[in-house]
Structure formats: structure tokens, C-alpha cells
From Swiss-Prot:
Pfam family, one: GMP_synt_C
Single GO MF annotation: GMP synthase activity
A GO CC term assigned to this protein in UniProt: cytosol
Pathway: Purine metabolism; GMP biosynthesis; GMP from XMP (L-Gln route): step 1/1
Function: Catalyzes the synthesis of GMP from XMP.
Origin superkingdom: Bacteria
Signal sequence range: none
Subunit description: Homodimer.
Protein name as catalogued: GMP synthase [glutamine-hydrolyzing]
Sequence positions that bind ATP: 230-236
Gene3D superfamilies: 3.30.300.10, 3.40.50.880, HUPs
Keyword set includes Disulfide bond: no
Encoding gene, per UniProt annotation: guaA
Length: 539
């Protein structure tokens, strides 16, 4: 029986990151809405409770509170951002609107020597104060500590940025330790979970395989399952896991919607039929998809259409399988959170995903999502544990809607053909270029990264087609052709990301090749936006 951490979700977009950090400490956790009953909290029997952030305000909204049972259990509690504020209010403190809202990077001073922060610091001031580089995102502030609490941290704009009641094991921070921008955030959460809560670090992927296989077999029984392959990591690992559980009861449906990467169809069929020996049905539905996308420019509408057409194709294939009762998808946690699909339904929707946003109730198939509670790095770990080849597991993610969300505005076959070739050239250059000692000296990578390809050093890289034309000169003639943007990011969880600082020489070669080899593109730009504020995909 695993020790469990209960994460109460108040609607933050990054609540799942808290779960990821807890699991990185090899401790099992679950996310549940903040308004669960006292009985549920008691029956869950957590080793500790973590209260998430929220886009709401404790000062204005008095409905979002933690159940009373949280305070009656006698277990450690960690409040994060809004979680700190509701802890303060519920335990007798005071929260008010801040005149100095904090959004982004901040330097925070630790006070005292609490068990949570003692010895954890990024640098020390000349006066000897330990400082932490943290990520803030709040408009309210704790103005008065609850009885029994002491000041744990502060910033110039937030006098109470952390508080602690060590006797009861209650800790709260105004910053977000779960995001990668907080340098020591992972260490802080690990200390809370392992040392303060005393949870056993026994959550590993091999255990998850056994549990997931058993769950799939129990759910499916002797019924048949169809799964749509996109060529990406998520659907590949989902297929391998389900195949491990039920073998030939699984039929993989590979849909060519006309929005695939260059030579993707052949690669997917060779990999799954040749390596996994799985049943794969190849469906060419490119005319159907592109026809329905004609004239559509709104990103949400495009995603909905692509999702709807996937469902129709699956329904048609399911009718050919007499026992097909299940539709399997490679949905993972980031898909769910970006669709406003956390269990509380309080998160603000950023964009819908075809995996979770276009499935009608009239589908006629039950939904099987074995990866729904996993993050991308966990999915990769699971793939390795399942014995999948590295070229499959560590391939960059590819969205289900394919190039449809990498072509801005209306999707046309002409645009898709241009983008396919530009994208392939960019990936070739990333795969063919290794990091050098000069790159490390310039701060583009770490010394341990020297010798690795830039494809392996980036988490996701691709080209984006911009349906605008610019003037150029090639030879002695004037050109008026399209623009493409290159995008490469580095991240551990895909909830936040930094743009990749690629060598100029690599970018120069990619640009030169695209302009010379892809007739119809005469300008290449590089996207240097992080997430947040941008998302990784452009649409």
C-alpha cells in the first residue's frame, strides 16, 4: 500500500505540476477538487495535504475553502499561493488586496530556520541572508498571520511570502515551487513530502505498469479496443501498454488526415507492424479532413473539426470489428489541464485538445485513457519500462491535429506540403548537429551535454507555416513568398517551457536550406517565446 499525498485543486492551471513534483520524489499522490467532503478526506488517509493555487481570490471569493477535515487530520499541510491565502483565512489570519501585484520572477528572503526552507537557498546576500529565486503569480497577500504562525519568507513587494506553524506541520508559500522557474522548488516539495510528511518513496513506473495492465484487463474484459495512432509518443506508449494487457484484442487505426509529417505514414506502419507485431489498419482520410477544413480559420474550430472527423473515422472502423466496444486515446495530463478539464472544472480554458474536446456522447464506444494521469516524462519512462525502442520513446511530441495547428489560419494542401518539407529540414539539422565545447562555454548547454545532438537537447522542435508573404531577392529576381517560423523549446513537463538557445550556425543552416530547397518560402524566423506567456504550439 503506497503512502498517499492528497492535492486539493482550487483551479490552478499548474496543479498537475504539483503532482509531478511529488511523483518525482517517488511518492504516490492524487488530485481532487477542493470541495470534497470531510468523509472523503478522512477515508483517503493522506500522509500530507497540499493546497494548490487558483485564479480566484480569497479576498473576493469566499466559496473556495479546504474541507475542515484537512485541519482535523493532524497531518502536515502545504499551501501554495492561493493555498497559502485560504490557509491564512481559515486559521484566523487576514488576506487583503495587494497594491503591488507580483507576476513573474522574484528574489525572496528566508526568515528563521524552518524545516521546510532551512539550508535551501540560491545565493546569500552581503548581510548573510539566504535568498531564493522564485516565481510569483498573485494579486492578494496575507496581511496578518494566523495564531501560532511565524514569518518564513518575504519579498520587497510581499512582506509575508511564507509562513509556518512548525508545531502542527503547517507551511505556506506565496510563490510557486512546482514550476521550473523556481530554481529550488523541486527540492522544497521533496523536503515537505519525504522529511516533513515522512512518506515512503516507493512509487515507480514498474509498479504503475502492473497496476495499469490489471486495470485495463478489468475494464475491457474480452471486448475489442481500437486506438488511433498519430505517430507521437503518447499514442505509441498507450498502444504498447494496452497491447501488453490485451494483445490482439487491440486494433490500432492509423489515420492519414493529410496533416502528417514527411514520410510519417511509412515510419509508423513499419514501427508498429514490424516491431510490436500489433494489428494496424491504415486509413487514408486526407480528402475528408482537408475538405471539412476549407475556409476555417479559427483555431478552436479547426481542433473541433479534426476531433470530430477522427471520431467519425473510428466509428466507421469500429463497425468493421464485431466486438469493438472501446476507443483508446493517448490523452495525458497536460491535454486535460489545457482543456480546462481538471477534476474541479475551475481552471481557465486555454485551448481545447482533440483528445478531450471533440468526443460526442453519441460515440457508441467507451473511452479508455490509460495515460490520463501521467506527464510527458512519466510517459517516456513508462515507454522505456515497456521495452519500446528509444527512437519511438524519445521522439518529439506531435499533436493529434497534426500540421493543422501548425498552419496559421486556413489549412490548405499546398501549405501542408510546404510545411512538411521545411519541418523535415529543421529536424534533420537538429539531429545532425551535436553540441560542442564552444556551445557549452557560450552557455547554450551544459558541459555534460557536449556530444549530444541538439534534437536530444530540445524537448520539442518544429516549423510553423505563416500564411503571409514577404518580399525577397533570389538570384537577380524578386520573390514574394511565404514565411515559416522555427520553434524549439526545452522543458521537463510541458506545463512550462523555455525557448531553446540554439547555435546561430545551426539556425543559419536550417534557414538557408529551407529557403533554397522549399520553393514557396523565402523567409525564416525563430520563435523566442517562453511558456507562459505563449503556449508551445502556435494554435
Amino acid at each position: 500500500m503506497h503512502d498517499k499525498i492528497l492535492i486539493l485543486d482550487f483551479g490552478s492551471q499548474v496543479t498537475q505540476l504539483i503532482a509531478r513534483r511529488v511523483r518525482e520524489a517517488h511518492v504516490y499522490c492524487e488530485i481532487h477538487p477542493n470541495d470534497v467532503s470531510d468523509e472523503f478526506v478522512r477515508e483517503f488517509a493522506p500522509k500530507a495535504v497540499i493546497l494548490s493555487g487558483s485564479h480566484a481570490s480569497t479576498y473576493e471569493d469566499h466559496q473556495l475553502r479546504a474541507p475542515q477535515a484537512v485541519w482535523d487530520l493532524g497531518v502536515p499541510v502545504l499551501g501554495i499561493c492561493y493555498g497559502m491565502q485560504t490557509m491564512a483565512v481559515q486559521l484566523g489570519g487576514k488576506v487583503e488586496w495587494s497594491d503591488h501585484r507580483e507576476f513573474g520572477y522574484a528574489e525572496m528572503r528566508a526568515h528563521g530556520h524552518t524545516r521546510l526552507l532551512d539550508g535551501i537557498e540560491d545565493f546569500t546576500t552581503a548581510e548573510g541572508h539566504g535568498m531564493l529565486k522564485v516565481w510569483m503569480s498573485h494579486g492578494d497577500k496575507v496581511a496578518e498571520l494566523p495564531p501560532g504562525f511565524a514569518l518564513m519568507a518575504s519579498t520587497p513587494s510581499c512582506p509575508i511570502a511564507g509562513m509556518a506553524d512548525e508545531a502542527r506541520g503547517y507551511y505556506a508559500v506565496q510563490f510557486h515551487p512546482e514550476v521550473t522557474h523556481t530554481v529550488k522548488g523541486r527540492q522544497i516539495i521533496e523536503r515537505f513530502v519525504l522529511q516533513i510528511a515522512g512518506a515512503k518513496p516507493d512509487w515507480i513506473m514498474s509498479n504503475h505498469i502492473e497496476e495499469a495492465v490489471a486495470k485495463i484487463r478489468e475494464q475491457v474484459g474480452d471486448e475489442e479496443v481500437i486506438l488511433g495512432l498519430s505517430g507521437g509518443v503518447d499514442s505509441s506508449v498507450a498502444a504498447a501498454l494496452i497491447h501488453r494487457a490485451i494483445g490482439d484484442q487491440l486494433t490500432c487505426v492509423f489515420v492519414d488526415h493529410g496533416l502528417l509529417r514527411l514520410n510519417e505514414g511509412k515510419m509508423v506502419l513499419d514501427m508498429f507492424e514490424g516491431r510490436l507485431h500489433a494489428k494496424v489498419v491504415h486509413v487514408d482520410a486526407s480528402e475528408q479532413f482537408l475538405g471539412h477544413l476549407t475556409g476555417v480559420t479559427d483555431p478552436e474550430a479547426k481542433r473541433k473539426i479534426i476531433g470530430r472527423e477522427f471520431v467519425e473515422v473510428f466509428q466507421a472502423e469500429a463497425k468493421k470489428l464485431s466486438k469493438a466496444k472501446w476507443l483508446a486515446q493517448g490523452t495525458i495530463y497536460p491535454d486535460v489541464v489545457e482543456s480546462g478539464g481538471t477534476k474541479t472544472k475551475k481552471a481557465t480554458t486555454i485551448k481545447s485538445h482533440h483528445n478531450v474536446g471533440g468526443l460526442p456522447e453519441t460515440l457508441g464506444l467507451k473511452l479508455l485513457e490509460p495515460l490520463r494521469d501521467l506527464f510527458k516524462d512519466e510517459v517516456r519512462e513508462l515507454g522505456v519500462a515497456l521495452g519500446l525502442p528509444p527512437e519511438m520513446v524519445y521522439r518529439h511530441p506531435f499533436p493529434g491535429p497534426g500540421l493543422g495547428v501548425r498552419i496559421l489560419g486556413e489549412v490548405k494542401r499546398e501549405y501542408a506540403d510546404l510545411l512538411r518539407r521545411a519541418d523535415a529540414i529543421f529536424i534533420e539539422e537538429l539531429r545532425g548537429t551535436t553540441a560542442t565545447t564552444q556551445d557549452a562555454a557560450a552557455g547554450l548547454c551544459g558541459e555534460a551535454d557536449v556530444g549530444k545532438t541538439w534534437y536530444d537537447l530540445t524537448s520539442q522542435a518544429f516549423a510553423v507555416f505563416l500564411p503571409v508573404k514577404s518580399v525577397g531577392v533570389m538570384g537577380d529576381g524578386r520573390t514574394y513568398d511565404y514565411v515559416t517560423s522555427l520553434r524549439a523549446v526545452q522543458t521537463t513537463d510541458f506545463m512550462t517551457a523555455h525557448w531553446a538557445h540554439l547555435p546561430y550556425a545551426l539556425l543559419g543552416r536550417a534557414s538557408n536550406r529551407i529557403i533554397n530547397e522549399v520553393r514557396g518560402i523565402n523567409r525564416v524566423v525563430y520563435d523566442i517565446s517562453g511558456k507562459p506567456p505563449a503556449t508551445i504550439e502556435w494554435e
